[in-house]
Design a protein with these regions (language model features):
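Short, isolated positions in well-ordered beta-strands
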Residues: 13-14, 21
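Short, surface-exposed, charged amphipathic helix/loop patches that serve as local interaction elements
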Residues: 20-92
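Short acidic, Pro/Gly- and aromatic-enriched capping/linker segments at domain boundaries
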Residues: 1-12
């Protein structure tokens, strides 16, 4: 199993199994985030699922805490989406 590791521009370090990028659940969840017809509440729920699918519970919690530290205790959805975009576009 090959791992993708990296660090976002904001300094969050992560590692995940590269196979996740071709997993059915990953593609399905990502598709709902990109679909303009998907309700915003569903997109947020699916983004949470996608983060946990990629990073697992521990790294997801670490990411949210990382974002909170940079935003006076808040984790703005825009920042979470930005980090998720960087993580999923990373190639080893």
């Amino acid at each position: 199993m090959e791992k993708i590791t990296g660090k976002t521009q904001s300094g969050f370090s992560y590692s995940y199994d590269q196979r996740i990028m071709t997993d059915w659940d990953f593609i399905t969840l990502l598709g709902t985030l990109m679909d303009e017809g998907t309700k915003e509440t569903e997109k947020i729920t699916n983004m949470q699922k996608l983060l946990k699918l990629i990073l697992g519970d521990e790294q997801t919690n670490e990411l949210i805490e990382h974002i909170r530290k940079q935003n006076e205790g808040y984790a703005p959805i825009e920042e979470v989406m930005k980090e998720l975009g960087e993580i999923t576009s990373q190639k080893n």
